[in-house]
Amino acid sequence: MMITLRKLPLAVAVAAGVMSAQAMAVDFHGYARSGIGWTGSGGEQQCFQATGAQSKYRLGNECETYAELKLGQEVWKEGDKSFYFDTNVAYSVNQQNDWESTDPAFREANVQGKNLIEWLPGSTIWAGKRFYQRHDVHMIDFYYWDISGPGAGIENIDLGFGKLSLAATRSTEAGGSYTFSSQNIYDEVKDTANDVFDVRLAGLQTNPDGVLELGVDYGRANTTDGYKLADGASKDGWMFTAEHTQSMLKGYNKFVVQYATDAMTTQGKGQARGSDGSSSFTEELSDGTKINYANKVINNNGNMWRILDHGAISLGDKWDLMYVGMYQNIDWDNNLGTEWWTVGVRPMYKWTPIMSTLLEVGYDNVKSQQTGDRNNQYKITLAQQWQAGDSIWSRPAIRIFATYAKWDEKWGYIKDGDNISRYAAATNSGISTNSRGDSDEWTFGAQMEIWW
């Protein structure tokens, strides 16, 4: 009995240590991709994206090593109330050498408090830098609703018929506002903070296994006292989003309609841009005097329409499928807008629960508002893959791939004598435009991808 009593303090200490370790356990999440590739005509792997398109079909078409490393921990919990601290550091290099130095991007650092407001059970208040309720198309790595950045908000307020979320975030533009001495001659330049105010109502039941989410985003350039935006710069804008999600075939289909105005049209995802639409240059006079000018250059006043349908479904025990179809029209007052449509599929055949073959076929077509010319590209990738599971979403995955792309481009981006971005008809020389002309290429390689 004496021996048993002596062992008791040690057992209590060990148990306390285990419980303490569990309470202090750190969550480790993240994403990464890396690989090696070659181009048929020689050299390292090339990647293919149509000029004017805001994304590309990514399977066998990613030329960088990218990683997001997330560390988080629930630092306090009492009943159903809790605080969670979350961080995210991202890295990107060109995967050309063993040692590639890079400056990491500190993308997330926030605290989320759940059930802290007694009269709003189930809600979460938060503050800090955060990936906030992002909506994307995975197969083209396209974020169509993403206001991520430093901010604060409250989310998942239960209204009975749906859940309400409110947030404010910021994205700053370099050199967006000026102090002027006279007309367009400026003395100083200052970065401009663009604020975004976001309202979302989610979980609206519309039909069996179908839900609707509605959102309104207002973005504005918030200048410091004594500074103002150059003439022609967009000052604010709106974006409206409606997204219907249908659960089907062990997956989902999302149908999205979006409309944006002015400062919200450039990125088209809920973040304002346009305060830096007026660039600057310096003129040096014969006596050595330097005069700084603010150009009345680009503004994004106008509107954007987007209609998008995408999803991922299972077509039986052996087949899975990802797909996307999108039409987007940016109509700007300065005629520098684009009309872009894209369609693509990625079927997956599963030989075993951990081995599969994927085929990705994607097509992009982009029309210049100014010239009326079109750029088009199609890209085909065949990949053999080994993955941790039998789903098209299963990761980690190791794949070997071969990619073929063909394009015919009639216009490209250039700047005229006033440093204004314009479009021009493509030339074979590639000197007067940035168009890729009419050509094709193929690549091959291997890649790993993981999220956890």
Curated annotation (Swiss-Prot):
Pfam families cross-referenced by the UniProt entry: LamB
Site (Greasy slide, important in sugar transport): 31, 66, 99, 252, 393, 451
Catalytic activities: beta-maltose(in) = beta-maltose(out)
Recorded GO MF terms: carbohydrate transmembrane transporter activity; maltodextrin transmembrane transporter activity; maltose transporting porin activity; porin activity
Site positions per UniProt: Important in sugar transport: 143
Induction context: By maltose.
Keywords noted in UniProt: Cell outer membrane, Disulfide bond, Ion transport, Membrane, Porin, Signal, Sugar transport, Transmembrane, Transmembrane beta strand, Transport
Residue ranges of the TM segments: 27-35, 65-78, 81-93, 105-115, 123-130, 149-159, 162-173, 192-205, 210-222, 235-248, 251-263, 301-315, 318-333, 337-351, 354-369, 373-388, 396-410, 437-451
Subcellular location: Cell outer membrane
Residues of the signal peptide: 1-25
Membrane topology: Multi-pass membrane protein
Gene Ontology CC entries for this record: cell outer membrane; pore complex
Membrane side Extracellular: residue ranges: 36-64, 94-104, 131-148, 174-191, 223-234, 264-300, 334-336, 370-372, 411-436
Disulfide partners: 47-63
One Gene Ontology biological process: polysaccharide transport
Periplasmic side: 26, 79-80, 116-122, 160-161, 206-209, 249-250, 316-317, 352-353, 389-395, 452
Main location: membrane
Assembly information from the UniProt record: Homotrimer formed of three 18-stranded antiparallel beta-barrels, containing three independent channels.
Family statement drawn from the similarity comment of this UniProt entry: Belongs to the porin LamB (TC 1.B.3) family.
Annotated HAMAP family: LamB
Function summary: Involved in the transport of maltose and maltodextrins. Does not act as a receptor for phages.
Protein name per the record: Maltoporin
Organism lineage string: Bacteria, Pseudomonadati, Pseudomonadota, Gammaproteobacteria, Enterobacterales
